[in-house]
Amino acid sequence: MTSSTDYHADSTPGTTSNMELRIREYQLEMLNESLKRNLIVVMPTGTGKTQVAILRILADIDKGNSDKFVWLLCPTVALSEQQYIQYATVFLPSGAEDKAIWDNALSGIKIAVSTYQVLYDALSHGFVKLSQMSLLIFDEAHHCKKDHVANKIMQVHYHKQHQSGVQNLPKILGLTASPILSDLSSLEIVESNLGSICKTPRQYYAQLLQFTNRPLILPRLPTYTIPNCSVKAPILEKLCGILSSEDEVPSSSKMKSKQLKHIRRFMQTSESINQELGIWAATEYMRKSIMHFKESMRMGAEKTNISNYGKDFAMEILTRLGKLQDCSPAIQPEEISPMCQCLLDELSKAYREGFCGLVFVTQRATVLALKWLIENHPLTSHLFTCGTFIGMSTTQYSKTELGNLHDIRNQTETLEKFRQGSLNLIITTDALEEGIDVPACNTVLNFNCQLSLKSFIQRRGRARRENSQFIIIMEDESGPRYLKRLEMEEIELVQKLQNAERRQIPANELDFDKYERISLSLDIDRTGAQLIMREAVGYLYNFCSKLPAQLYVSNKPLFTYERNNYGRFRAVVKLPSNLDPSLQSFSSSRSWSRLKYAREDAALQAYKALYQAGLVNDYLVPTQVSDHLEGDIIFRSHYSIQNQLDPWQDIALLWKLDSQLYAHNLRIIRPEEDEIHLHMILPTQLDTTIHIPLFIDYCTTYTAILTPGHPITTDISLCQQVTNLIFQSVYRDHCSRRNLDYAFLLVPELEETKLIEFLERYSGSVSLTELLNQEATPSALGLLRSHTRPSRPLLVEPWVAGECFLPDELSISSFDAKVKYMTNRRNFLSHGNLAAGKSTNCEARIGLEANVKSMSVRDFFVDKLPSMFAQVALFTPSISHEVEVYMIAQILRQELSLRSVTPWQRIDLLAIAIRPTSIEHRATFRLLAFIGDAFMKYLFAMQLFLHHHLWHEGLLSSLKQRNLSDAGLAHAIHQSGLGKFLISKHLNGKRWVPPLVSGIEPASNEARQRSIGAATLADMTKAVVGAAFTDGGLNQAAACASVMFPKLKSWNASSLHDGTYSKTRPENAVASTAIVDMEELLGYTFTDKSLAVESMTHPSCTGLVQTTSYRRLSFLGASVLEWIVVSYLHRHAQVMNPQRMQSLKSAFTNNTFLTFIAITFHQVREQNHIDVDDEHNVHKNVTTCSIRLWDFLRLHSDALSTELSDFVQKSSEKADAIKHELWEQRFYPWVRLRALGDMRVLSDIIQSIFGAVFIDSQATLASCDALAEKLGIVPLLEHFISHQITTDHPKDTLQAILPGRKVSYQICVDKVHPGTLRCSALADSSEIASVEGQMNDEVIKMQAAETAVRLLRKGFALSETS
């Protein structure tokens, strides 16, 4: 006979106030046992173990020990939260890392609830002591084994203190339904680890059995009449083929392993689903996984500069799959595996009214795949509403993990819906096996999972309603035999512990408006941020206020309300059209008794959607640029980067390793003199020809040409001696005859015999007397050196008759010759101060001006080495410096080529691009940086636009501006380590000495740092990208940009080509006939008509929910147009300098010029009018009308419509004058253009049209080039280039005319005519020119500057400025 006892807890801490517990005798039996010793309570699932724990807690609290508290430990976050909600005083989550926080949290409490890990960390850090606790409760105590954190608590802390004699340790209470994990032998292990003994009710065991409903166990085997699903899904088959071809590409095993990590794991999971569930499920899983992965990668592309080779490689591989086909809604029998068909059959048979079931599977991926299959299969789709559960641990895969589609944030909601009955089936892993409170089920299925005794008992325990069933789908005939063995083991366990099932009473739920208003919220687990319903309206208004502001546009949310037949309200909120159509309209989730509540609910639903779209961050404030940058990023004006790469360190190492040697032919071309031919020998190969200008004087330039190397075998010792001989001619003080291990060798010949002959012939010196007696010619003379006093060597110039006088007698004491001192210069790479010595009489000689002078023969001796080799030694610092730069460029080329399809050809451009501070190459560098800047803006704008289709233009612009700023680009270089390639060291010729292998310091693990300005680093990045474009075109530049700036992805346009972006476009935005006229005007036919509509939709159009406004397309189109202009200028780069190109770009892309284009661009069409007079005669009249682009503008602002019409009407005459100046007067009318006024909407639609055509044409620039031609931008640009028409801004021109003078402008209002302004242009406070007019400040300043320029060029106003 069953009996029970009522136990009332009156406002006891740790329990719900006035909570009534119905206590059964077997529970009291367990309570009494726990008061005697450390105990593990073993009772079946659902029989009230938690009540035993509560009784034990209350008994402990009743002792009145105010200094101690009870700690309840749970294995999972979900379970600990569940226990906290029902009974606890304080729930302690993870992450508190401050003792003060712990002390404050535990102050005055009686019960603490946490996971095992939280307590273990707190004990390990010393934040909490076991002596503070009176009772330690382990829920799901069977986990206390091996390396489980529950066992660590006992072994590391409890047992260790117990063995050391500590007395005041807490009592232990364990709770479990099955004290074993695998077999019966683990029982004693658990008891030993917890220092407790397992007990189960004995005296009241019969009563325990009365509260247990055991399900009918039904083992099932598949009938293999269904075709075997051994064929792979088409996507899987295609992906296998791509990977097979990729395996043939040579690559290092380490790199290949990194690249294939993600894609192979995904393949293994997909193959497992293909085998377990069949083709349909595998196809659906792969298709959705790939789409989710691509979208996540695009959304996160700009967040970090750290490359993930595996994910980037996976992205590139998956892009090659092309457009993925949707699964067929009609599932064919051959698309289902036999085991899965068996599962579907059993599910359909088991279904009855009030069905409530679980399906256990092995893999996380199988959970979703099976859910989709059940929801789409004709046998089950109409019977089940499915949810999924995989656990609440926050240690989940990244959002960009290929194959990870689970969102743990939705799982609490899944359990809640299951309890309410809106879901009747959950697909799960072992996460729902134990602990978490779910309603009693009437059907549980185990699908192809190997059961242990523990999992058998736990899963069967979930089916505890009356007449429930536990269906086990088995693979083969061995399954039933194994099941029998488990049942026998359970009988043995029951005999030992008298175990049975448990039952939980679900918590009561309130269902009225006030409670719902309090309970509805948006919670962010990561940050703890929470938005409750009553605050949602304020948050939504704040979000809208952060959207880009624009005239005639209200960014406030608009609420409307509906009242149903029962007097309850629903609200709809409409958000500004700057947002994506999917984010423009939201309804309240239910009807409410008060209009205020409906409004708050709609606002909350809107804010949830904005958060899911990434427009609100984890702190529930509008997303900022910083949210998409690394957390610790700080943009600075200067960055500490690695020291400049020293290629001589590698050269020195190669010399020491006796590597293959390469000879490079070196020619020095000397105008009006013989060329010098040598060989430079290096242990590495330069694979490009290097041209090195050597500036001798203002009029003379030599050219050193170093050709690609070829392998040689030669006597190194001889080569070193020859090199030493050449170097000693100039660097005698730095050259030793003992240490000859030069980093490079210079020799005139490669044959050993000729080298020996060279040494024998030219080593040493000879007296001048002896040389003159041999009647040697000056060209054969070496350097003259004085015996008597230290001085620079002398060069003997070629002479003509009469310039050298030699006496007839043999004993010569003096002679006259044309000589000069050898120059001190060692740097011939720059003009230096040569310009100051400009002369009309230029001589191509090394040294000072030669003079005829009389010299004592005895005072001099002569080097046997001809002086031309001394010239080579003089040029060597300059040549070796350029070789060093090219070697650095060659190493950088190798890094860039890893991602480039096209091999680099112009390494000379790369050598210039890495020298941002070089004066000699400044013009070319600026040209490359100019090109690279525009190209990166174009690419990044496209990437942001495509990857973040839900982001508004303000966020896109901010992120682009921040990332492509000098600091953003510099930070990328700083992180990537590519800063070592930047050349900041200039040649110091006077300190140069021949480099020795023994004197070169080896590379150190601790790289030295140097401070470089952010602008310098950014300029290098742009120039390298510009060099890539100049060398190999768009593809090479894009690949290079992705290396220099890793946030810029080489696959940034993939969503256009695989159909992903097209799925984000609105359907049926407008009938195609509505834009035919617009297409005819533009000369372009849109494939996606919604793009044409969007490009003409003003932000004032709120509530259409068809497209977003044109702001996003305008953002993209501005960069596209800029690149079109820059690429056109690049094709004419030979005829203009970078400053001129920058001026032209500004002139043809600024907003006022685009406004002018919008006003003047039109098409004249004929219209036929049929009139019928009173006599019924038909008259046909033909009239003409002008179709203009702004005629198609969609707007909802009467004020803007009126102002736009007035503006166009007033500007028509001004536009004609501007057109005349542009085409006829060959003059860029800055003043007239600016005077047109600021009608931003017109320039915006020009840019948005470029953006629309670019996207519609699949990022085809040719279509945009044609549009620029059609609009008249390219013809006008060509006109300005061919006629060399200046486009410099008047202010810039005035400042250029007056270098060093301070130019300023003074504006005052005419006192007689208050509407008139007077502006004076001043140079150092002296007036140059003044103008008057009725215009704004900016225009009148431009007019004053223009007038001043005109006067100065005509010679006026010079006296005032002199």
From Swiss-Prot:
- Pfam families documented for this protein: DEAD, Dicer_dimer, Helicase_C, Ribonuclease_3
Protein known as: Dicer-like protein 2-2
**Role this protein plays:** Dicer-like endonuclease involved in cleaving double-stranded RNA in the RNA interference (RNAi) pathway. Produces 21 to 25 bp dsRNAs (siRNAs) which target the selective destruction of homologous RNAs leading to sequence-specific suppression of gene expression, called post-transcriptional gene silencing (PTGS). Part of a broad host defense response against viral infection and transposons.
Record-annotated Helicase ATP-binding domain positions: 30-197
> Which keywords has UniProt assigned to this entry?
Antiviral defense, Antiviral protein, ATP-binding, Helicase, Hydrolase, Nucleotide-binding, Repeat, RNA-binding
Per the UniProt entry, the Enzyme Commission number(s) are 3.1.26.-, 3.6.4.-
All copies of domain Helicase C-terminal, residue ranges:
343-505
Lineage: superkingdom: Eukaryota
Family from the record: Belongs to the helicase family. Dicer subfamily.
Leading EC class: hydrolase
All residue ranges annotated as the RNase III domain in the record: 889-1033, 1075-1258
Q: Which residues form the signal peptide?
A: none
For ATP, which residues are the binding ones?
43-50
Q: List GO terms (cellular component aspect).
A: cytoplasm; nucleus
Write down the PANTHER family for this protein, in alphabetical order. DICER-RELATED, ENDORIBONUCLEASE DICER
Please give a single GO biological process term from the UniProt record: regulation of defense response to virus
Q: Where is this motif: DEAH box?
A: 139-142
Q: Which CDD domains match?
A: DEXHc_dicer, RIBOc, SF2_C_dicer
UniProt xrefs under InterPro entries: DEAD/DEAH_box_helicase_dom, Dicer_dimer_sf, Dicer_dimerisation_dom, Helicase_ATP-bd, Helicase_C-like, P-loop_NTPase, RNase_III_dom, RNase_III_sf
One molecular function GO term is: ATP binding
Q: Which residues form the Dicer dsRNA-binding fold domain?
A: 536-630
